[in-house]
Protein backbone atom coordinates (compact mmCIF):
# COMPACT_ATOMS: atom_id res chain seq x y z
CA UNK A 1 0.00 0.00 0.00
CA UNK A 2 2.81 2.43 0.90
CA UNK A 3 4.63 1.57 -2.31
CA UNK A 4 1.51 2.39 -4.36
CA UNK A 5 1.06 5.71 -2.55
CA UNK A 6 4.72 6.59 -3.03
CA UNK A 7 4.50 5.71 -6.71
CA UNK A 8 1.35 7.81 -7.08
CA UNK A 9 3.08 10.78 -5.44
CA UNK A 10 6.06 10.42 -7.81
CA UNK A 11 3.71 10.33 -10.80
CA UNK A 12 1.88 13.44 -9.57
CA UNK A 13 5.16 15.29 -9.08
CA UNK A 14 6.37 14.26 -12.54
CA UNK A 15 3.13 15.40 -14.11
CA UNK A 16 3.37 18.74 -12.33
CA UNK A 17 6.88 19.20 -13.71
CA UNK A 18 5.70 18.20 -17.19
CA UNK A 19 2.82 20.68 -17.02
CA UNK A 20 5.12 23.50 -15.97
CA UNK A 21 7.50 22.69 -18.84
CA UNK A 22 4.58 22.61 -21.29
CA UNK A 23 3.28 25.96 -20.03
CA UNK A 24 6.72 27.46 -20.66
CA UNK A 25 6.71 26.02 -24.18
CA UNK A 26 3.20 27.37 -24.79
CA UNK A 27 4.35 30.86 -23.80
CA UNK A 28 6.73 30.81 -26.77
CA UNK A 29 4.16 29.58 -29.32
CA UNK A 30 2.46 32.30 -31.37
CA UNK A 31 -0.81 31.92 -33.26
CA UNK A 32 -2.47 34.27 -35.71
CA UNK A 33 -6.14 35.14 -35.82
CA UNK A 34 -7.65 36.76 -38.90
CA UNK A 35 -10.75 38.61 -39.97
CA UNK A 36 -11.93 40.28 -43.14
CA UNK A 37 -10.23 37.71 -45.38
CA UNK A 38 -6.89 38.40 -43.71
CA UNK A 39 -7.15 42.18 -43.83
CA UNK A 40 -6.92 42.29 -40.02
CA UNK A 41 -4.50 39.94 -38.27
CA UNK A 42 -3.78 39.51 -34.57
CA UNK A 43 -0.79 37.53 -33.35
CA UNK A 44 -0.82 36.30 -29.76
CA UNK A 45 1.05 33.81 -27.63
CA UNK A 46 -0.57 30.78 -26.09
CA UNK A 47 -0.54 32.78 -22.85
CA UNK A 48 -2.99 35.20 -24.49
CA UNK A 49 -0.44 38.02 -24.83
CA UNK A 50 -1.18 40.02 -27.99
CA UNK A 51 2.11 40.56 -29.82
CA UNK A 52 1.01 42.26 -33.04
CA UNK A 53 -2.04 43.74 -34.71
CA UNK A 54 -1.77 44.18 -38.48
CA UNK A 55 -4.40 46.18 -40.34
CA UNK A 56 -4.38 46.37 -44.12
CA UNK A 57 -3.79 49.96 -45.17
CA UNK A 58 -6.90 49.89 -47.36
CA UNK A 59 -9.00 49.76 -44.17
CA UNK A 60 -7.48 52.90 -42.69
CA UNK A 61 -9.93 55.73 -43.05
CA UNK A 62 -12.82 53.38 -43.73
CA UNK A 63 -15.76 52.94 -41.43
CA UNK A 64 -14.40 53.04 -37.86
CA UNK A 65 -17.10 50.71 -36.53
CA UNK A 66 -16.35 48.09 -39.19
CA UNK A 67 -12.64 48.24 -38.37
CA UNK A 68 -13.37 47.81 -34.66
CA UNK A 69 -15.55 44.79 -35.45
CA UNK A 70 -12.81 43.25 -37.59
CA UNK A 71 -10.20 43.72 -34.85
CA UNK A 72 -12.53 42.12 -32.30
CA UNK A 73 -13.21 39.22 -34.68
CA UNK A 74 -9.48 38.70 -35.29
CA UNK A 75 -8.77 38.68 -31.54
CA UNK A 76 -11.57 36.16 -30.99
CA UNK A 77 -10.19 33.99 -33.80
CA UNK A 78 -6.74 34.10 -32.21
CA UNK A 79 -8.20 33.14 -28.81
CA UNK A 80 -9.92 30.11 -30.35
CA UNK A 81 -6.68 29.08 -32.02
CA UNK A 82 -4.78 29.46 -28.72
CA UNK A 83 -7.35 27.23 -27.02
CA UNK A 84 -6.99 24.59 -29.73
CA UNK A 85 -3.19 24.57 -29.59
CA UNK A 86 -3.21 24.53 -25.79
CA UNK A 87 -5.62 21.59 -25.68
CA UNK A 88 -3.51 19.65 -28.18
CA UNK A 89 -0.25 20.30 -26.31
CA UNK A 90 -1.68 19.64 -22.84
CA UNK A 91 -3.29 16.40 -24.04
CA UNK A 92 0.19 14.97 -24.46
CA UNK A 93 0.95 15.80 -20.81
CA UNK A 94 -2.35 14.34 -19.61
CA UNK A 95 -2.03 11.22 -21.74
CA UNK A 96 -0.96 9.07 -18.81
CA UNK A 97 -3.85 10.12 -16.59
CA UNK A 98 -6.54 8.04 -18.24
CA UNK A 99 -9.01 10.93 -18.41
CA UNK A 100 -12.39 10.21 -20.02
CA UNK A 101 -12.62 10.99 -23.73
CA UNK A 102 -13.73 14.54 -24.43
CA UNK A 103 -12.69 15.87 -21.04
CA UNK A 104 -10.91 19.19 -21.52
CA UNK A 105 -7.55 19.72 -19.89
CA UNK A 106 -6.70 21.66 -17.82
CA UNK A 107 -10.01 21.37 -16.04
Curated annotation (Swiss-Prot):
One of its GO terms (molecular function) is DNA binding. Keywords: Cytoplasm, DNA-binding. One of its GO terms (cellular component) is bacterial nucleoid. It is found in: Cytoplasm, Nucleoid. The keyword Cytoplasm applies. Its main location: cytoplasm. It comes from the Bacteria. It holds the Pfam family YbaB_DNA_bd. Gene3D superfamilies: Nucleoid-associated protein YbaB-like domain (3.30.1310.10). Binds to DNA and alters its conformation. May be involved in regulation of gene expression, nucleoid organization and DNA protection. Homodimer. Belongs to the YbaB/EbfC family. This is Nucleoid-associated protein NE0434. It comes from Nitrosomonas europaea (strain ATCC 19718 / CIP 103999 / KCTC 2705 / NBRC 14298).
Amino acid sequence: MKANLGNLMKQAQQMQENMKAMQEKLAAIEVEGQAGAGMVKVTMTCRYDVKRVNIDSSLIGDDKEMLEDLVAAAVNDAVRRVETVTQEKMASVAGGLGLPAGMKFPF
